Each structure stands twice: as structure tokens, then as C-alpha cells.
């Protein structure tokens, strides 16, 4: 059965003042779809971009980390980073109901 569900997107910063992140607040999708969650950031000291997934009532689960430009693929999830554009994204493929969660990008 195909149904629409929400992916909630949040943001988290590292410990340095003067940083900012931008992400959409929610994404609606259907099972089997491909969803791209974008993250732009501004920071004076950048070491990498991490992505986390958190289900209601649970602890955040680490998904990926990019320190260098390019695409990192891990199963159905891929993450991309462009340091020169201060931009990254998380790509979720073959979306499943269990993917309904909050997603966080975090700058280090």
C-alpha cells in the first residue's frame, strides 16, 4: 500500500559562535520515492558535515559524515558535500515507512 508520510528535518550546530544552518522544516513523500534534504551552512571553521536520523522517543542515529567534497553512499542513503558552496544534502532512495523520522545535519 502506498501512503504519504512526513520526514521532519531539523538542524544542529557545532560549538562555534557565528555559525548558521538552513534546512526545510518538513518534507512529505510517498513510499518508493527519492527524497533530497538540503543543508546550507555558514561557519568560520569547518571540519565536516554529519547527518543523523531520530525516530520519535529515540536517540539520534548517525547516518553519514562528509569531510571532503563529493558523494558518500551507504545503502539507500547517500550524502553529498560541496565545501566551496557551503552546501550538502542527504539523499534517501526507495523510501520506506520506517524512514519517517527527524533528520539533522550538523556542522563540525
Swiss-Prot record:
Give the record's GO biological process terms. Answer: adaptive immune response; response to bacterium
Matches recorded under Pfam families: V-set
Sugar attachment sites are 38
Q: Where in the cell is it found?
A: Cell membrane
What cystine pairs are annotated? 39-105
Q: Which residues form the Ig-like domain?
A: 19-108
Residues annotated as signal peptide: 1-18
Q: Which UniProt keywords apply?
A: Adaptive immunity, Cell membrane, Disulfide bond, Glycoprotein, Immunity, Immunoglobulin domain, Membrane, Receptor, Signal, T cell receptor
The record ties this protein, via PROSITE patterns, to: IG_LIKE
Family annotation (InterPro entries): Ig-like_dom (IPR007110), Ig-like_dom_sf (IPR036179), Ig-like_fold (IPR013783), Ig_V-set (IPR013106), TCR_variable_domain (IPR051006)
Of the GO CC terms on this record, one is:
T cell receptor complex
**UniProt KW Ion transport keyword:** no
Subunit details: Alpha-beta TR is a heterodimer composed of an alpha and beta chain; disulfide-linked. The alpha-beta TR is associated with the transmembrane signaling CD3 coreceptor proteins to form the TR-CD3 (TcR or TCR). The assembly of alpha-beta TR heterodimers with CD3 occurs in the endoplasmic reticulum where a single alpha-beta TR heterodimer associates with one CD3D-CD3E heterodimer, one CD3G-CD3E heterodimer and one CD247 homodimer forming a stable octameric structure. CD3D-CD3E and CD3G-CD3E heterodimers preferentially associate with TR alpha and TR beta chains, respectively.
Q: According to its UniProt entry, what is the function of this protein?
A: V region of the variable domain of T cell receptor (TR) alpha chain that participates in the antigen recognition. Alpha-beta T cell receptors are antigen specific receptors which are essential to the immune response and are present on the cell surface of T lymphocytes. Recognize peptide-major histocompatibility (MH) (pMH) complexes that are displayed by antigen presenting cells (APC), a prerequisite for efficient T cell adaptive immunity against pathogens.
Q: Which PANTHER family match?
A: T CELL RECEPTOR ALPHA VARIABLE 1-1, T CELL RECEPTOR ALPHA VARIABLE 1-2
UniProt name for this protein: T cell receptor alpha variable 1-1
- Could you tell me which species this protein originates from? Homo sapiens (Human)
